[in-house]
């Protein structure tokens, strides 16, 4: 078995390592490392290369790249790249330079990738904000990333204004009427995206040299410590993601985009990776099951990228769906965000026998790449997330002792690959605790790798809650709860849900004399957070179990919850 990942030197060194690697599992006894069984992917040697130029240079025969599912507007590949070049010229004229941060607050749109690709082509950094986030949440992101410019829609400009505490220049992404209300000195409207797309650059801009190691995107994640941090993804990270997609998927396919482009799953696929493969991407502004299925039928989609709750919904509504929609063009569902159970997978295949489900596993910190399934045969390994992706190395580490483990032993998964992030933005301490000196990313997930090299995710060591594919940090919700005048103590844990995967649940200790109710607590939190962060269940306790150092014993609470389900 040829193993080339992370190996320097001549062929004899590679060969000597090859002899120590188990062909079935990919495990090397001498290094205690699992090596990918996939064919290694080639990465461009040119150090001075931005991801936009790399994507634009990829060979394919695709004609239409984006279709607006609502309006029917289509963008060809030449129109995409002309738009990217023109918007980049306008951004340069506005003073955007290499290293500057530009924020985009927008639902899915066929124009979203034009913005992100043009920003990255300048060597500037795109940061994405979720439209369903509250103004307070967006304000924290703005305060941390300090953008020099924002792109948003007319409907969201008021939310952006509420989130900004300085005169943030804004470019509007649509042509709807902007309310005449004043936004004070919080935002300054400086242009419209459609005008930029039609504008020839007025001056010959000096193109700054972009290094593959420069930061291209800043996506916010709860990380491994539970507080939101900016994940710095380099041009090299995104180029490696494109090559991983090329190894996994065919060229010139058709798909529907419903996953938010602000999320790594959507950004990596629909705003970067799949463009390089010549795919046609039909864009829905937000998820709607009927519109999704109708789009599959109308546009003859061959692939769908879905989060587990949507897969579950398709299983539960299979009879009606199959009688109402023609899904004969669909042959592959790519599932990510959380593992699918064997029961759900089997029922899906039973109801949609011509469709295979390819599961995958990744993090924002790994540019969404870690493990994946490539073909129908691999889908039969129920519960698995697939094999380690090309060029990915893995280690299983005992979280208590630090001892490196082997095949079929459960511990924290560490990975090393060209897709591992540069680090957390302006947070050296968090970066050092997440990536070690040898480049190993500590995923915070308890996993094991079986004798055939398949990765199984067992639990979340890092305690994050995954609700509808989004990360929810218990610490954030606990801080909110403890701010309530009638709450003495609080702990938040996940509660399993067939559709959402998990929901946040709170254990509450009321202050003496308080009669605070479950509904009052849920309402208190709901007013301050995004929908996926809402508390869905409350249980009252006399005290929260903690260890001597004061750390919440979440596993004890999980046991208590499980016993009551």
UniProtKB/Swiss-Prot annotation:
Residues that, per the record, bind (E)-4-coumaroyl-AMP: 265, 337, 359-360, 364, 462, 466
Binding of ATP, residues: 221-225, 229, 359-360, 364, 445, 460, 551
Name of a matching Pfam family: AMP-binding
Main location: other
Alphabetical keyword list: ATP-binding, Ligase, Magnesium, Nucleotide-binding, Peroxisome
Molecular function via GO: 4-coumarate-CoA ligase activity; ATP binding
Top-rank taxon, per record: Eukaryota
Motif (Microbody targeting signal) on chain: 563-565
CDD domains xrefs: 4CL (cd05904)
Ranges for region SBD2: 360-424
Cofactor dependency: Mg(2+)
Enzyme Commission code(s) on record: 6.2.1.12
Enzymatic reactions: (E)-4-coumarate + ATP + CoA = (E)-4-coumaroyl-CoA + AMP + diphosphate; (E)-4-coumarate + ATP + H(+) = (E)-4-coumaroyl-AMP + diphosphate; (E)-4-coumaroyl-AMP + CoA = (E)-4-coumaroyl-CoA + AMP + H(+)
Gene Ontology CC: one annotated term: peroxisome
Domain notes: Both substrate-binding domains (SBD1 and SBD2) are involved in the substrate recognition, and are sufficient to confer the substrate specificity.
Protein name, UniProt field: 4-coumarate--CoA ligase-like 2
Lineage summary: Eukaryota, Viridiplantae, Streptophyta, Embryophyta, Tracheophyta
Gene name tied to this protein: 4CLL2
């Amino acid at each position: 078995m040829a193993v080339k990942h992370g190996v320097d030197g001549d062929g004899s060194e590679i060969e000597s390592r090859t002899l120590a690697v188990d062909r079935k599992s990919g495990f090397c006894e001498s290094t205690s490392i699992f090596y990918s069984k996939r064919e290694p992917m080639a990465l461009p040697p040119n150090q001075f290369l931005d991801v936009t130029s790399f994507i634009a240079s990829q060979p394919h025969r695709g004609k239409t790249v984006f279709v607006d599912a609502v309006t029917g507007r289509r963008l060809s590949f030449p129109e995409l790249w002309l738009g990217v070049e023109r918007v980049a010229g306008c951004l340069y004229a506005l003073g955007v330079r290499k290293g500057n941060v530009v924020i985009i607050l927008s639902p899915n749109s066929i124009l979203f990738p034009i913005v992100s690709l043009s920003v990255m082509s300048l060597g500037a950094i795109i940061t994405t904000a979720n439209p369903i986030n509250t103004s307070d949440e967006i304000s924290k992101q703005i305060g941390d990333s300090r953008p020099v410019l924002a792109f948003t829609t007319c409907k969201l400009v008021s939310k952006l204004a509420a989130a900004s505490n300085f005169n943030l220049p804004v470019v509007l992404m649509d042509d709807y009427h902007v309310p005449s209300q004043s936004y004070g000195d919080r935002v300054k409207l400086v242009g419209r995206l459609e005008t930029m797309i039609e504008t020839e650059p007025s001056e010959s801009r000096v193109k700054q040299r972009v290094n593959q190691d420069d930061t291209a995107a800043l996506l916010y994640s709860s990380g491994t410590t539970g507080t939101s941090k900016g994940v710095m993804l380099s041009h090299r990270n995104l180029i490696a993601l494109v090559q991983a997609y090329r190894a996994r998927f065919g060229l010139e396919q058709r798909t529907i985009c419903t996953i938010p482009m602000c999320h790594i799953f959507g950004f990596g696929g629909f705003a970067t990776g799949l463009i390089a493969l010549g795919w046609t991407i039909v864009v829905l502004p937000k998820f709607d099951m009927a519109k999704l299925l109708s789009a599959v039928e109308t546009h003859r989609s061959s692939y769908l990228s879905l989060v587990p709750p949507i897969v579950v919904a398709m299983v539960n509504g299979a009879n009606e769906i199959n009688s109402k929609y023609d899904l004969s063009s669909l042959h592959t569902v790519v599932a990510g965000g959380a593992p699918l159970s064997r029961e759900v997978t089997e029922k899906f295949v039973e109801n949609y026998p011509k469709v295979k489900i390819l599961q995958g596993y990744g993090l924002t910190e790994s540019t969404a790449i870690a493990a994946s399934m490539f073909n129908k045969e691999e889908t039969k390994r129920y519960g698995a997330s697939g094999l380690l992706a090309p060029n990915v190395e893995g280690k299983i580490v005992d979280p208590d002792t630090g001892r490196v483990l082997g095949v079929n032993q459960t511990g924290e998964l560490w990975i090393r690959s060209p897709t591992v992030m540069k680090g957390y933005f302006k947070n050296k301490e968090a970066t050092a605790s997440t990536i070690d000196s040898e480049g190993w990313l500590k995923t915070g997930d308890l996993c094991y790798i079986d004798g055939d090299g398949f990765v199984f995710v067992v639990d979340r060591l890092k305690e994050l809650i995954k609700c509808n594919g989004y990360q929810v940090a218990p610490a954030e919700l606990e801080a909110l709860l403890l701010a309530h005048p009638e709450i003495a103590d609080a702990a938040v844990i996940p509660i399993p849900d067939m559709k959402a995967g998990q929901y946040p649940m709170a254990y509450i200790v009321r202050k003496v004399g308080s009669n605070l109710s479950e509904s009052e607590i849920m309402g208190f939190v709901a007013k301050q957070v995004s929908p996926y962060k809402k508390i869905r269940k409350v249980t009252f306790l006399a005290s929260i179990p903690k260890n001597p150092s004061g750390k919440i014993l979440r596993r004890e609470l999980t046991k208590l919850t499980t016993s009551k389900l």
